[in-house]
Amino acid sequence: MLTAHKITVLINIFFIFSNYNNIKAHLVSYPSLTSLYGTSLKYFSVGILFTSNPIIFIIFVYSIRESFYSIFSSLVSGMLSIIISEAILFITYFWGILHFSLSPYPLYNEGIILTSSRMLILTITFILASASCMTACLQFLIEKGMSLEISSIVFIIYLLGECFASLQTTEYLHLGYCINDAISGTLFYCVTGLHFSHVIVGLLLLLIYFIRIVEMYDTNSEWSYSLYGISYIVLPHTDQITILYWHFVEIVWLFIEYFFYSE
């Protein structure tokens, strides 16, 4: 006797064989004239299977290990997960940029004239490079023990971030196209706007970091001690997530500069 499950299976088999000639055995790939032909959707799917899944598994195992053997593991592992997820989000946008810029049709930047000044972009890049150097110094001082000058370094990094936000806003005000002007304008505003929001979050983290350091010095809490007449503060390991997040923002900007501003 035919049951409902058997009837459903027979119907599916009937539709499969009736449309056998119309079934495609491959995914739609890029045109052969583009440089993305070697990484078409078929091979990209295989790449996801052998790259993303093992990475997610390694992160999962690492989080379990850190939850048992590390004191501040939950916050650090959570921050690493956030950074990795944001990196994957930016990768999807960069993939879209490559897709439309290397495809022969439609034109990627039809009717778009980039009006950003080269000096403005170089200034923005120089500011973030300076912030990266200061962040490296901050990381070194955290590992060795923080002196009284560390609060000034954090404040300088915060000021550099404010300068970046001001220059980015100036660029937006002088652009000659909008977000709905072709796919180029859409991707430009989406990617740079998303990065701008990450910079704002990084500035908030730096501001909180600076306030915590000042309060620790003012209250002379148990975090501070003196050695050979020099005052130090030992901060918990969780404060390094701010530095890690700021480095991530700087690296993303280098990719943005390459995709949008390089010739």
From Swiss-Prot:
One of its GO terms (molecular function) is cytochrome-c oxidase activity. It comes from Plasmodium vivax. This is Cytochrome c oxidase subunit 3. It catalyses: 4 Fe(II)-[cytochrome c] + O2 + 8 H(+)(in) = 4 Fe(III)-[cytochrome c] + 2 H2O + 4 H(+)(out). Keywords: Membrane, Mitochondrion, Mitochondrion inner membrane, Translocase, Transmembrane, Transmembrane helix. Gene3D superfamilies: Cytochrome c oxidase, subunit III, four-helix bundle (1.20.120.80). Belongs to the cytochrome c oxidase subunit 3 family. Disulfide bonds: none annotated. It is an enzyme of class 7 (translocase). GO terms for cellular component: mitochondrial inner membrane. Component of the cytochrome c oxidase, the last enzyme in the mitochondrial electron transport chain which drives oxidative phosphorylation. The respiratory chain contains 3 multisubunit complexes succinate dehydrogenase (complex II, CII), ubiquinol-cytochrome c oxidoreductase (cytochrome b-c1 complex, complex III, CIII) and cytochrome c oxidase (complex IV, CIV), that cooperate to transfer electrons derived from NADH and succinate to molecular oxygen, creating an electrochemical gradient over the inner membrane that drives transmembrane transport and the ATP synthase. InterPro entries: Cyt_c/ubiquinol_Oxase_su3 (IPR024791), Cyt_c_oxidase-like_su3 (IPR000298), Cyt_c_oxidase_su3-like_sf (IPR035973), Cyt_c_oxidase_su3_a-hlx (IPR013833). The lineage of its organism: Eukaryota, Sar, Alveolata, Apicomplexa, Aconoidasida.
